[in-house]
């Protein structure tokens, strides 16, 4: 059993607490400085206002002012579940209280820009920690797809945990893998984060495959025969994700 601290009480942070809790870990969710009222709502009814489901009974929800105290009680794993815009804030706040080499895993998806180049969020957080005087960091990333409501309802979900030291993500995977939350591991942080960030662009194209298949045929034909186009778009999506990953020096 591990002590897992999740920073961010939103949909994905709370959903991630389900497999963590089901694996008999001690789980604490700390809301951000903007989520104090949100934490009160959850604690009053034990229902997440966005996910619309009961939260696990053994998951503790605390306000942001408890962050330092909770980490000092020994957090074995810190999970960052804030928005991509909140990564800088989270890095700053964690820098104030972080113990050396405490494992961190980021649920947040996205790419940042630094010095006119793309930067994956794990590398951004490492850079910000270094800037704030934390020289030794241990940051992993998560690639999906993983919709929060699906995970909170314990449907089969497959994800990838990535760290340049694969032993670290193998250990984290053992902590949270369940019979419905299936974790693969990779040492390609750039590749996993890049594909996780851009996959939704391609998923929109796949979702539009019926309309894109051929504008010169009837709607009935499109409805029955769009799968060729969907398959072609899927193939092109994989090619382009590979090209983008290579450009960012992933594997």
What residue spans do the PLM features occupy?
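Rossmann-like NAD(P)(H) cofactor-binding subdomain of soluble oxidoreductases
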Residues: 57, 61-68, 72-154, 172
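Electropositive phosphate-/nucleotide-binding environments in soluble metabolic enzymes
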Residues: 10, 14, 32, 36, ...
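Short beta-strand/turn micro-motifs composed of small residues
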Residues: 8, 30-31, 82, 108, ...
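Conserved hydrophobic residues forming the short capping helix/wall of the S-adenosyl-L-methionine
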Residues: 46, 125-129, 245
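Nucleotide donor/acceptor-binding cores
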Residues: 2-3, 102, 157
């Amino acid at each position: 059993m591990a002590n897992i601290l999740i920073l961010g009480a939103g949909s994905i942070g709370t959903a991630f607490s389900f497999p963590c809790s089901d694996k008999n870990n001690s789980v604490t969710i700390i809301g951000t400085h903007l989520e104090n009222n949100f934490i009160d709502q959850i604690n009053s009814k034990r229902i997440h206002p966005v996910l619309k489901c009961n939260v696990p009974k053994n998951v503790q929800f605390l306000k942001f002012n408890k962050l330092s105290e909770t980490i000092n009680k020994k957090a074995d794993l810190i999970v960052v579940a804030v928005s991509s815009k909140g990564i800088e804030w989270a890095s700053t706040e964690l820098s104030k209280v972080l113990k050396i080499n405490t494992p961190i895993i980021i649920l947040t998806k996205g790419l940042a820009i630094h010095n006119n180049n793309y930067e994956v969020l794990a590398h951004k957080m490492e850079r910000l920690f270094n800037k704030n005087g934390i020289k030794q960091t241990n940051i992993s990333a998560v690639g999906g797809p993983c919709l929060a409501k699906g995970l909170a309802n314990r449907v089969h979900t497959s994800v990838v945990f990535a760290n340049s030291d694969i032993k670290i993500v193998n250990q984290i995977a053992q902590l949270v893998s369940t019979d419905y939350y299936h974790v693969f591991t990779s040492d390609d942080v750039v590749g996993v984060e890049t594909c996780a960030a851009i996959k939704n662009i391609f998923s929109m194209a796949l979702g539009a495959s019926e309309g894109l298949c051929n504008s010169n045929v009837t709607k009935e034909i499109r409805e029955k025969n769009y799968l060729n186009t969907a398959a072609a778009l899927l193939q092109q999506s994989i090619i382009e994700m590979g090209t983008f990953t290579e450009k960012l020096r992933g594997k």
